[in-house]
Design a protein with these regions (language model features):
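Short linear motifs in intrinsically disordered
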Residues: 53-54, 73-75
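Non-catalytic accessory segments of DNA primases and related replication-initiation nucleases
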Residues: 1-63
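Short glycine/Trp-rich loop-beta-loop segment that forms part of the substrate-binding cleft
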Residues: 68
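Secondary-structure boundary/capping signal
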Residues: 13-14, 29, 71-73, 149-150, ...
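Phosphate-handling catalytic cores of nucleic-acid transaction enzymes
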Residues: 60-63, 71-74, 93
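Phosphate-handling DNA/RNA-contact segment within nucleic-acid enzymes
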Residues: 79-167
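Residue-level detector of intrinsically disordered, flexible termini
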Residues: 15-16, 45, 49, 74, ...
Length: 167
């Protein structure tokens, strides 16, 4: 185009060429406006998870039903299982969703390392704590083993982290 031709002929930048052309045509050269920065406010993860929990309903998860687990009181969000993750002191660190087809996702901003999903309540200081890889396994174990606490470490890479914190 014309600006490129002027820039090449005079050995200057496109911006400098545009200024020269504006001067020749007696046109004011617009000054660039600074980009308005909108402060990005990200809600704390516990607050975002609380909002998701409030939107959820209680029901039976198709994912768990396919695995043969009858658990009618699960938290569901758009037909996906909504599992809140936490630390030993009860701090909410995020959530995992599991779709009916088994696709698992962590909610954006979830802190996975050292977090787990409770499959049974932590009452006092339990004598036995069983840590499983995933939630379905944790539920199965909690139905078979009524003494103690069962935790799901979200995935294999987090098993050691959770075990070290529990110890």
């Amino acid at each position: 185009d014309g600006l490129d031709l002027v820039a090449r002929a005079k050995g200057i930048t496109i911006l400098a060429a545009a200024k020269q052309v504006a001067d020749v045509l007696a046109m004011p050269f617009p000054e660039p406006k600074p980009v308005k920065e909108q402060p990005r406010t990200v809600k704390p993860i516990a607050e975002r998870i609380a909002e998701l929990v409030a939107k959820s309903i209680r029901g039976e998860s198709p994912y768990l039903a396919k695995k043969g687990l009858q658990c009618p009181n699960q938290r569901l969000l758009q037909n996906s299982l909504l599992l809140v993750t936490q630390t030993l002191d009860g701090t909410i660190t995020g959530a995992q969703t599991i779709k009916p087809n088994g696709e698992k996702r962590l909610v954006s901003g979830t802190q996975k390392k050292g977090s787990f999903i409770l499959a049974s309540e932590i009452i006092g200081t339990p004598d036995t704590i069983i840590i499983t890889e995933g939630y379905a396994t944790a539920l199965t174990v909690s139905q078979l083993h009524h003494d103690g606490t069962v935790l799901a470490a979200i995935d294999e890479s987090n098993l050691l982290n959770v075990a070290e914190l529990v110890r």
